[in-house]
Amino acid sequence: MKKLLYLLLVAVFAIISCCNTEQKHTAKVYMTKDISAEGLVKVYEALGVKPKGNVAVKISTGEPGGRNFLKPELIKELVQKVNGTIVECNVAYQGPRYTTEAHLQTAKEHGFLDIADVDIMDAEGEIIIPVKDTTHIKYNIVGSHLANYDYMINLAHFKGHGMGGFGGVLKNQSIGVASGNGKAYIHTAGVIDTKEKMWDRLFTTEQDHFLESMAAAAQSVHDYFKNGDNIIYINVMNNLSVDCDCSAHPADPTMKDIGILASKDPVALDQACVELVFAVVPEEGNDSAPLIERIKSRHGTHIIDHAEKIGLGSKKYELVNID
């Protein structure tokens, strides 16, 4: 009888433990359909965080000629609410954002200098930060000014991407926070760490290796900010083109805007956004097929799978509508 009771108790505790584990690995993702300055602040406040110290707001300044990047009037209220600095890094390809001077000129033309200070984080060089997953990249090369910040708001424009399939918060803090050389290192999955030589291997790198390298780099930035305690994630799902904001001639969006989503878990957030896109039944005026094809053809969701595998976050989430 005692043995039976003991086994029963063990079973009960095992079930409780399993349930608790499930709860711990289910992230909350907050969502509003209100794509406005007010909606952005509202979804940010739903996270219940209070950033302290120097706050970096990581966005994409957008390539000249592009039109889908997050506009200053959308992000102004949030950036000023947290007394944030807009941060970016130079790109690895020749163009208007290749040098700091030209990049700042682009930021000015796009209106970002009118709402906040803009810091090109690799303007004075780069630093190396550690990565946990060394399958491909052995370290992460980021803009040296990253060290000047105590907190980061990863504010991404969710959309398609020519190489990654889609770009959300994982891409925004991997390729986005990497210096020019760091971008080359990620794109070549740890083979080349000099942007001038990147083109020798850019198109011969295994696609999954590139995606896995992005996941590893994203994790290193997450861990850099006190193991994720000092970083939050927001995806704005508007202007859902198949092309990235790094394109000077992006395709027009074929589907309707969806909303703004936020979470403390970048894996859950990107997973939720991808599922929202896939849930749209293609129809006239709201055709999700091109973006879905872009994601599938690049095996884009592999970055999410790998990010979960290496412990960056969880694909399990609870979607909380705050409207």
Which ranges hold each PLM region?
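Bacterial Sec-dependent signal peptides at the C-terminal "C-region" and cleavage site
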Residues: 12-26
